[in-house]
Amino acid sequence: MQFLFTFIFLLIPLVYSLPAASPKSGTDFDFNQEIETFVEQAFNQDDPSQAAAAAASFEEFLVNVFNYDQADGQVDGQVLKVFEKRDANTEQTIEGILKAVNNSGVIWTLLDSVADDPSRIEYIGNLTSSFLKNYNITLNIADLLSESSSLTENLNITGLLSAVENSGLITSLLDGILLDENFRPRLVDLIDRLVLSQKNVLLYIFAGVLSKRDLMADGELVNVLLKRATSNDDSYSGSLGSFLNNAASTVLSSSLVSNAVADVLNALNDTGFLVYATKRFLSSDSYINMTVALVNDIVSSSSVTIDTSGLNITELISGTLGNPKEIAALVGSLLSGDSSQTSQLSNYLGRYSGALSQILQDLEKKGLFAELNSYIFGDSTTKASATATATATATSSANGKNVANNNNKDAATSGSATSNSSTSTNTKSASNGAGAVIYTGSNTQTTFLKALTILFGGALLFL
């Protein structure tokens, strides 16, 4: 469940991060017309050679994967057995499809047509919310994280993780994101924005969990992070969720899915498609803003109920942090280059230790830790009232950031993506001691803040 847990901690700050670029306004969005226009432009039906090539490719796909009989135009009835006995041709077919889709630019053309127009984003958000609202979907976070849930009991997590590891996809993704020095400024900028959007969460950790004070109850914190819906009037409430849960357990535990996952993962790794797509997506503020807007619309519409009643925030944080002093010491040693103190950490991080050290140093140059230190612990000239609460400090100082829209999306694949902000030291206006409920006049917590940056804003680095 490490992947799910990491995804939750990444999604929450992403949703609550302020948009960094303003998409241009457009006209009313006619979904059907847009799809027709898009298909006509992307696939030129007047070109016989292109049509013939597309037909041949599709027929080859049917023959190799579905055992398609061209004579009678039927698919063999033993489709599932064919899937389970697939050979290397299937993986090659998937690779060919990925390359064809990527080279056509279909994905990015479609994303651009939506991301650059607020009315289209709103339309898709409303359409999705209306569809989901009819099914009364409830996500129980505690149940998903529990090893005893019906989904995790039937799901072969070990097999899926093994398939991911054997494909080499995670290594390729980490190499492409962390070791690309041209992409690193963009990564630093994203981490900076995500962490600043979660200043109140950090305040809760320091002033509530680590200080053993009840600054904010777990339920109150969750209400700040996620908007919960309370509509349970339907007597059949949860029936669809139970069905989908059981169906997903059955499907995901089958050898059919395991084989398919392995082929797809290998194809994604061999083609480099995922690394390219991830870097290109992260290089565009308009894509990020679109994602934030869509998730906000869905969550705010209460079409999906997120149940966190069984989630013990304090226990999760305490278990994640372990020994705070030890973490702070390791991060401090990593920054100072003291190899005698960080040999074990360096061995664990391997070739990424240098990249992580540089990321932390760049974040320090941007003034991230100084701002967090001032916001949470106060400075030597300011002492905050002990009655301040995390909810009273909801306004993030990230409002002062101006990040230009990155139009060069293709730079990601060539390793030439550029940062939207300089890594030179920036002067940021922080509410000195605004959240310093417990600590005042201390700069000794800076290394600990850097550690928390990795745990929360930088969780992507450890996927």
Curated annotation (Swiss-Prot):
Reported induction: Expression is induced by HOG1 and during biofoilm formation, and repressed by caspofungin. Also regulated by SSN6.
Annotated keywords: Cell membrane, Cell wall, Glycoprotein, GPI-anchor, Lipoprotein, Membrane, Secreted, Signal
Single GO cellular component term: yeast-form cell wall
Disulfide bonds: none
Subcellular location: Cell membrane; Secreted, Cell wall
The name this protein goes by in its record: Predicted GPI-anchored protein 45
Post-translational modification comment from the UniProt entry: The GPI-anchor is attached to the protein in the endoplasmic reticulum and serves to target the protein to the cell surface. There, the glucosamine-inositol phospholipid moiety is cleaved off and the GPI-modified mannoprotein is covalently attached via its lipidless GPI glycan remnant to the 1,6-beta-glucan of the outer cell wall layer.
Glycan attachment sites: N102, N126, N136, N156, N269, N289, N312, N420
Gene (name only): PGA45
Proregion positions: 442-463
Domain of life of the native organism: Eukaryota
Signal peptide: 1-17
Topology class, membrane: Lipid-anchor; GPI-anchor
GPI-anchor amidated glycine lipid sites: G441
Region (Disordered): 397-430
